[in-house]
């Protein structure tokens, strides 16, 4: 089936999704399974860069991921040690042997969880972390300990997603577009990027920065206020804006924001460069 035909099939199924269940068989199930297989192998992705800049979202693939939940009942599955799981989505590496992992070309540390339909490119290092359905993690990237990559999130090449970082998903609450982390981005520990925010290439997000669609991103040098996009090669730290005065005239509570303090320079690169030895 061609991609165009598959997209049309998924769109039709979406319009009639109330009639789908775990008992559904035939072409409907085959179409959803094929979409998940293509996502899992990296042949398609929920969002992809456009030649003229920016990102194009393939909404039909998001629909396919959501439809798969309607088509599947939860079943028991092996967990860690004596702890079992009970879920609708199998794990990506279920049944993999040494040859299959060698073919994949990435490293998976014990405790890393990747659900089926997420794509992991060669050269990726997964510390004990979580990668959700439909996500795309490109080559040379490290997902560090306790980091989470949300549903359908797109992470570029040679990124470092530090410990405890959260990259938001699109399925709940339902978002129009996924979070996009472009190539060569460093995200500091315990930061959060959610609600379809795009972090453009080469940027450095400091520890403890929280950016959602409504977060003000302020360029300290120009005063420009941005929403939903961190410009390429920005260095971003947490900040706050003074709040409006309260009715009695006393200062109001300050509001969190993200501040672009400078553009990436050689000093910044020396502190955030990736270690090729860890990816060999």
Curated annotation (Swiss-Prot):
Enzyme class: transferase
Alphabetic keyword roster: Acyltransferase, Amino-acid biosynthesis, Cytoplasm, Diaminopimelate biosynthesis, Lysine biosynthesis, Repeat, Transferase
Example of a GO MF term: 2,3,4,5-tetrahydropyridine-2,6-dicarboxylate N-succinyltransferase activity
CC terms in the record's Gene Ontology section: cytoplasm
EC number: 2.3.1.117
Origin: domain of life: Bacteria
Pfam families: Hexapep_2, THDPS_N_2
Catalytic activity: (S)-2,3,4,5-tetrahydrodipicolinate + succinyl-CoA + H2O = (S)-2-succinylamino-6-oxoheptanedioate + CoA
Positions contributing to substrate binding: 107, 144
GO BP, sorted A to Z: diaminopimelate biosynthetic process; lysine biosynthetic process via diaminopimelate
Location in or out of the cell: Cytoplasm
Classification via InterPro entries: DapD_Trfase_Hexpep_rpt_fam, Hexapep, THP_succinylTrfase_dom1, THP_succinylTrfase_N_sf, Trimer_LpxA-like_sf
UniProt cross-references to Gene3D superfamilies, sorted A to Z: Hexapeptide repeat proteins, Tetrahydrodipicolinate-N-succinyltransferase, N-terminal domain
Pathway, per record: Amino-acid biosynthesis; L-lysine biosynthesis via DAP pathway; LL-2,6-diaminopimelate from (S)-tetrahydrodipicolinate (succinylase route): step 1/3
Subunit structure comment from the entry: Homotrimer.
Similarity field: Belongs to the transferase hexapeptide repeat family.
HAMAP family assigned: DapD
Name of the protein in question: 2,3,4,5-tetrahydropyridine-2,6-dicarboxylate N-succinyltransferase
Originating species: Granulibacter bethesdensis (strain ATCC BAA-1260 / CGDNIH1)
Name of encoding gene: dapD
């Amino acid at each position: 089936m061609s991609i165009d035909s598959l997209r049309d099939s998924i769109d039709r199924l979406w319009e009639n999704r109330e009639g789908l269940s775990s008992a559904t068989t035939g072409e409907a199930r085959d179409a959803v399974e094929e979409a998940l297989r293509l996502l899992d192998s990296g042949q398609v992705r929920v969002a992809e860069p456009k030649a003229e800049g920016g990102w194009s979202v393939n909404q039909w693939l998001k629909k396919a991921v959501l439809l798969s939940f309607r088509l599947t009942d939860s079943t028991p599955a092996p967990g860690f040690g004596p702890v079992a799981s009970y879920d609708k989505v199998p794990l990506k590496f279920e049944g993999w042997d040494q040859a299959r992992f060698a073919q994949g070309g990435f490293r998976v540390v014990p405790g890393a969880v990747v659900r089926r339909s997420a794509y992991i490119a060669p050269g990726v290092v997964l510390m004990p972390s979580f990668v959700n359905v439909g996500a795309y993690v490109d080559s040379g990237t490290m997902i560090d300990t306790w980091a989470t990559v949300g549903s359908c999130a797109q992470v570029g090449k040679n990124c470092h997603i530090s410990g405890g970082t959260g990259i938001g998903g699109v399925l709940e609450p339902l978002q129009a577009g996924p979070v996009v982390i472009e190539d060569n981005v460093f995200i500091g520990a315990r930061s959060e990027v959610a609600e379809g925010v795009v972090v453009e290439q080469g940027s450095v997000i400091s520890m403890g920065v929280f950016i959602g669609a409504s977060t003000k991103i302020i360029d300290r040098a120009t005063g420009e206020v941005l929403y939903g996009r961190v410009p390429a090669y920005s260095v971003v730290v947490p900040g706050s804006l003074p709040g409006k005065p309260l009715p009695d005239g006393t200062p109001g509570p300050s509001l969190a924001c993200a501040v672009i303090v400078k553009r990436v320079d050689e000093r910044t690169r020396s502190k955030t460069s990736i270690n090729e030895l860890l990816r060999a």
